[in-house]
UniProtKB/Swiss-Prot annotation:
Protein's name according to its UniProt entry: NAD-dependent protein deacylase SRT2
GO biological process: defense response to bacterium; ethylene-activated signaling pathway; negative regulation of defense response
Sequence similarity: Belongs to the sirtuin family. Class II subfamily.
Transit peptide listed as a keyword: yes
Cofactor: Zn(2+)
Reaction catalysed by this enzyme: N(6)-acetyl-L-lysyl-[protein] + NAD(+) + H2O = 2''-O-acetyl-ADP-D-ribose + nicotinamide + L-lysyl-[protein]
TM regions (residue ranges): none
Gene giving rise to this polypeptide: SRT2
Disulphide linkage map: none
Protein keywords: Ethylene signaling pathway, Metal-binding, Mitochondrion, NAD, Nucleus, Transferase, Transit peptide, Zinc
Phenotype of gene-disrupted mutants: Reduced ethylene sensitivity in the double mutant srt1 srt2.
């Protein structure tokens, strides 16, 4: 079959070997049978059109990054809450911001704990112990992460990221801490302390050598060429869609993918310095935040005169401790989050709203001397 005709001329030579790929048409979808390892694996993908995921990706973000199913439902913020939050910015001189997944759901990156989050479908993230002890678990993690990387990195900073960057430039934020690993704050112009690390760096568990994730992505592709070519040809579908063919994006960038893709023949690079195990530079569940990083975050929290939590349920103790420490030290404390948080009983101001929406409303209230967004 002519693959140029199937894809409407969007891409050429995607499948150079007819002996390896056998495409079929089925119900408007493209069905590919490709040799994953030693047997054929059947998968289904939607045919992309110009301007879609195989088109010019420098244009507006794809629809899956604007899907409101990712963002939990919330009523528009009322004026009373907007003014209360405005006064916190106006009255503080040492304001610390702590951000969580709720600032990135507006960019199409799902969270874990909201009604639309990863946990709602029964997903359990990999633990540090599982990753370090099981080579099979590592193959599964890296295969899923490789497949989701292009989609994850296509996300753009959202309204919360841009508003916070402007507030920083205006001197209204003294320090920012984030639980997120997606680096969207950096792309908006901020430089937060990454409490849980970042997926943009890969590190060796043996010698500590680290290098950019993009380089590791290239290494994975080089040693798994047939697998990589097949997986990159698949359009993963929209988040939450019934047509996503079992490939739903996770908060850390990996996607749900059938084990047939990785259980045999998928190889993982080792550290070029010591041949050790390579891991994303993130804090998996069951792992500890490096002492120096945790100490810095705690010192900042205790020295703040205001502490604002944005888009976090504070269910991880590392984040909850910071909020509690700031509150006990006498700081004005507030939370903007959709749904309950661990600190609801100790924080005097809790606002149930989308972070990006209320921050932009706050900037419209009065003069915070903030640069135009």
């Amino acid at each position: 079959m002519n693959m140029r005709r199937v894809f409407g001329g969007v891409s050429t030579d995607l499948f150079p070997s007819r002996s390896m790929y056998r495409p079929l048409q089925s119900g408007g979808n493209l069905v590919m049978l490709f040799k994953g390892c030693r047997r054929f694996v059947r998968t289904t993908c939607r045919v992309s059109i110009p301007g879609g995921s195989l088109g010019n990706e420098s244009k507006a973000p794809p629809r899956f990054l604007r899907d409101r199913k990712i963002v939990p439902d919330a009523d528009p913020p009322n004026m009373e809450d907007i003014h209360k939050l405005y006064r916190l910015f106006e009255q503080s001189s040492r304001l610390t911001i702590l951000t969580g997944a709720g600032v990135s759901t507006e960019c199409g990156i799902p969270d874990y704990r909201s009604p639309n989050g990863a946990y709602s479908s029964g997903f359990k993230p990999i633990t540090h112990q599982e990753f370090t002890r099981s080579s099979r678990a590592r193959r599964r993690y890296w295969a899923r992460s490789y497949a989701g990387w292009r989609r994850f990195t296509a996300a753009q900073p959202g309204p919360a990221h841009t508003a916070l960057a402007s507030l920083e430039k205006a001197g209204r934020i003294n320090f920012m801490i984030t639980q997120n690993v997606d680096r969207l704050h950096h792309r908006a112009g901020s430089d937060p302390l990454e409490l849980h690390g970042t997926v943009y760096t890969v590190m060796c568990l043996e010698c500590g050598f680290s290098f950019p994730r993009d380089l590791f992505q290239d290494q994975l592709k080089a040693i798994n060429p047939k697998w990589a070519e097949a997986i990159e040809s698949i359009d993963h579908g929209d988040p939450g869609s019934e047509k996503s063919f079992g490939m739903k994006q996770r908060p850390d960038g990996d996607i749900e993918i059938d084990e047939k893709f990785w259980e045999e023949g998928f190889h993982i690079p080792v550290c070029e310095k010591c041949k050790g195990v390579l891991k994303p530079d993130v804090i998996f569940f069951g792992d500890n935040i490096p002492k120096e990083r945790a100490t810095q975050a705690m010192e900042v929290a205790k020295q703040s005169d205001a502490f604002l939590v944005l888009g976090s349920s504070l269910m991880t103790m590392s984040a909850f401790r910071l909020c509690r420490a700031a509150h006990e030290a006498g700081a004005m404390t507030a939370i903007v989050n959709i749904g309950e948080t661990r600190a609801d009983d100790i924080v005097p101001l809790k606002i149930n709203a989308r972070v990006g929406e209320i921050l932009h409303r706050v900037l419209d209230v009065g003069s915070l001397s903030v640069p135009a967004l």
